[in-house]
Amino acid sequence: QLGRIIYEMIVLEIDSVKEFMQHMFQGSMFDRFHLRSCEVTTFATFHIDGRCFDDWFDSDEKRTDETGLVTWNMMKTFVFSWIKGNKVPQKMLFDFCHYMPNGDVGSIQIRYEKDKLQFVTGYMQKEFSLEKKGQQAWDDNCLQFIKKHEIVSTQLE
């Protein structure tokens, strides 16, 4: 990822944290996204580096694609086990990504802290360009994604 230019485009404040988390952990909302990293703070801070080590699996169990990253579907049950219970986590950060055919990468960060949940988009270009169509398309797709799942949010400036 070194050398990529990261653009942060939109920040959405999610109105219903509980509803969003149900989509995330019990639904399939993010299942196809790759998980670059995850950090959850409860009584301790837990980290996940999303790199998948295929050598760990048997040959008939190969789990990753060319990205070398795990998918959210592979990890959500594991992460949910850290947070289920009577107390909410102090902090959570999820860094999801989607690889484009042209080599660019769209990202979504989910940031939770102090009862506030934010959905933040980003875009990394494989090569420097003044062209912003890919970034705008990613933004538009993310907004449609939120709308499709009927998530109520407020766009922050």
Locate predicted features.
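Generic "edge-of-domain/loop-turn" microfeature
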Residues: H34, V40, F53, P101-G103, ...
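Charge-rich, low-complexity N-terminal segments
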Residues: L2-W72
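Short amphipathic alpha-helical segments
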Residues: Q1-L12, K147-E157
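Surface-exposed, low-hydrophobicity interaction/linker segments
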Residues: K62-K116
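Mixed-charge, glycine-accented linear interaction segment located at domain edges/termini
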Residues: T121-E157
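Generic structural hydrophobic/aromatic packing signal, biased to beta-strands
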Residues: M21, L35, F94-F96, I110, ...
